[in-house]
Amino acid sequence: MKPLLVVFVFLFLWDPVLAGINSLSSEMHKKCYKNGICRLECYESEMLVAYCMFQLECCVKGNPAP
């Protein structure tokens, strides 16, 4: 009976955790500084120009002027 209670508590608390992750997915691929895109990590052909929320990187294609 006790393991069943633990499973129910875990499932009840898991929903707010997933809600927090969804805010991260809404920030990914969002437009940012100098027409860049927020990503987890910039590609080799892109340059990091700023940081977005949740430590995402704002990436711009090519090598833009400073």
Curated annotation (Swiss-Prot):
Its main location: secreted. InterPro entries: Beta_defensin_dom. It holds the Pfam family Defensin_beta_2. Keywords: Antibiotic, Antimicrobial, Defensin, Disulfide bond, Secreted, Signal. GO terms for cellular component: extracellular region. It comes from the Eukaryota. Residues 1-19 form the signal peptide. Has antibacterial activity. This is Beta-defensin 134. It comes from Homo sapiens. The gene is DEFB134.
